[in-house]
């Protein structure tokens, strides 16, 4: 009132009138006194990014932040200090009451209450911002430093558990809001009874926990059912197709709706705000008319309460007549000479329209008024005819739209109305997209953009606030096929090469991919030198976007099975990734990367945010944003405003789709969220190859952000550390000594960081052989799990996994370091190298194995630490059997007995969760034939481990999953394979040494398809030693004795009394259980002592005498003079030649 009366009085009195205002500001400052002034000033200067990680406990799996014990103690002290302060003045009390009551509104209010005169931004009192804590609230500027209570994930609807009589606009939790006084909302699955008091509003409303909402099978009402993602209720399994998350009925309806237009966003764009009363009524009539038509043809009737009611045909005719009367003076010169409707808009008319239109809304309405010649002609037709049919009316409106849409779209694509006429005419001559095609399909309007025009002028950002009406009307009045879906996002960029003389280059949007330009071409050195920072002014490919845009890429419409989520149906190749196996039965290292889940990282840097501003349903929003593709997901936060690193395991096709359409996906994230966490402020999103920035409705895609000085880890040693021990890691990679580089390590939801010291020699800063060290603290409670080692410099870098396990498993995993250190990373800037990277190389295969093993160890550690049967069993249950199969094959092929045993123990724990999982696990183990593989490799240690592995069931019964008589292909058992292999005595010994002695019993009785036993196989291949070994074991078992081979002699140990009392008592005292122990101990106990007999022992004397006798005889014969009766005497010395 004072500001309205002020101009009527003298200036001194006006200044005197506003004197009562300062007490309000003083009261606000007095309320802010209990908070540390330095902390508040620092928070305002830093934009909320100077928060202390020790004050928050972060759940890396649920993506929720809670105040730590230190924060609770600090808040308790502050609350006690606040109670001793003076009560706030009445004006401030009224303001606080207004804040509390403002949360009950439907959309929230932006109020400037005068508490701070210097505050330029209005105070947000929307339900998401009016969080009430247990203690009196500080001023809004210091609110982030305070612990909030659980806020609702969405506005609570009537009838939901969160809207029960709890009062006050609800915190979303509701406590016992599900029913009566002492009850609480619980999951409807049999034997679950999960408390949904603190669960999301969606889960409380539908009475299903998060786990059973995603599982493929659940027992509900003594019947196996599955939760439908679209119906939000359970259906029998017979109503679902294999691999589908929605029932067939809803999928069929989705397929029908998919072929129609989606006018939801168009209708929301066309609505004029209620406070814009200065706009002309004719513009309101045009917009409302087209809005009604959009509502008639869509499936969203009743979803938008602000849309006017549907009039009958008489009212529509009256509106058109009104428009005709307004433009009667101008319609004669612009109407076509023929009374028939001309669906082809002339080029000259479009050119004039382009010259007259601008980006502002007022000039756009003028363009709409000048393009109503179709309405004028048809209005005359209405006077001549009787009541026209509905199809005739829709034809008239489509004609008018055909003549009005090119202006708006062209204005949108051009970005400015002062372009030269030469460029416009040239653009129209080379782009026939504005002309309706000759096949009489539905009208399509696309923007025309010249290549040179787009390259010469600098990019411009088109910002569309929520309160403004977009200056374009991308509306189709008739149903169309998939080919007719326009993609407005790509139009300006797709036709940059439209001047090409090759007709194949000028493809229509219906046959072109969503983004045809190359965001990351091969860069020169000069380009890399220019792009040295990721700052806000970096050269970017700026695409015109607004919050109202929801048009998904064209290629995504080809899927007819998965439900539409956030306005974008997923790619059809997703389902094949879910059902595909991770590796081959014979060679796991030759599997294709497309059939495996890839582990990657998405980083969000949120400016001006801190953990208190993170919504409670952040995990659900990210999962919905990624179209439920992630199989695994973890997140870690650290200061620097708020840096959220998301590690996800998704199919390779999902990663590729995200990289190709990151700009559009970020728009979907902002528009699909109901919270201001994404909509307001500024944030960056980084994947492995792209960077997108968002600020106040404008989205940018970085043209090239990876530079030649980007730090990159190529090797970490050791790759496996013992849990609970302090370890020093050696990091190798590129550009690790650049100033500003930091090393981070994820640990139990927090980060351990280290600043890299700059190299003393400037010439060695940018090199490919940097070496750094990083010390791990060795947390005692962390026995099994995984670290992620990250390097970062200016929001660029990569990560490397490190496994946490026991010493024996770490020793086996460290054998992979040779494979990792010997190979190099693939440079993704080259197309050829990127194509070759599609085939997993040895290093990629090792990293994939470490990532998968890390996900499993994380789940196993969580289940072990929690010691909750329900949560732990269900947690491991979602680690698929196919992924277990891959890990078992990879480990067993390398003869890692310790790791294989650990994996089998975790698998056994998982299989005990349900009978179906047990059956599925046994089928998987029977398919991969681990024992057969060990026999072929002649791995006696692995074979002995497998045949002796036992699973103890809940009823104390024992199950041996690896039996030596299990028949494989052709009826061959592991015994047959061992009998046919040479030098496999140890393998036969291990197979016939199983606890149940099945191997001994089946050596003669197990037959293959040809009726041959293992004994026969051994005889045919002259492996008689195997039969002798088995026969000796059978005799020993029959006689209750043990046979030990010492050299080539057999020593029989009769356990019934054949051995001396001394030896017998010694053996019984040692309780020999293993044949190896028997051989070692009994060889020392039973070997007779050999007394030294010197050199005159009898065997030596006999040999020496024999040799001496032979030597004497030879010498006598050779030296004697021989005489013969005939001939002269013979002497050996004169022997030359002659006869004897």
Curated annotation (Swiss-Prot):
Keywords: DNA-binding, Metal-binding, Nucleus, Transcription, Transcription regulation, Zinc, Zinc-finger. GO terms for cellular component: nucleus. Residues 73-112, 124-177, 327-382, 403-472, 496-517, 558-597 are annotated as: Disordered. A zinc finger (SBP-type) spans 184-261. Residues 450-466 have a biased composition (Basic and acidic residues). One of its GO terms (molecular function) is DNA binding. A motif (Bipartite nuclear localization signal) lies at residues 244-260. PROSITE patterns: ZF_SBP. Expressed in stems, leaf sheaths, and young panicles. InterPro entries: SBP-like, SBP_dom, SBP_sf. It comes from the Eukaryota. Residues 76-100, 125-135, 403-430, 579-593 have a biased composition (Low complexity). Residues 345-375, 496-514 have a biased composition (Polar residues). Zn(2+) 2 binds at residues 228, 231, 235, 247. Residues 164-177 have a biased composition (Gly residues). It is found in: Nucleus. The keyword Cell membrane does not apply. The keyword Heme does not apply. PANTHER family: SQUAMOSA PROMOTER-BINDING-LIKE PROTEIN 15, SQUAMOSA PROMOTER-BINDING-LIKE PROTEIN 4. The SBP-type zinc finger is required for the binding to DNA. Trans-acting factor that binds specifically to the consensus nucleotide sequence 5'-TNCGTACAA-3'. This is Squamosa promoter-binding-like protein 15. It comes from Oryza sativa subsp. indica.
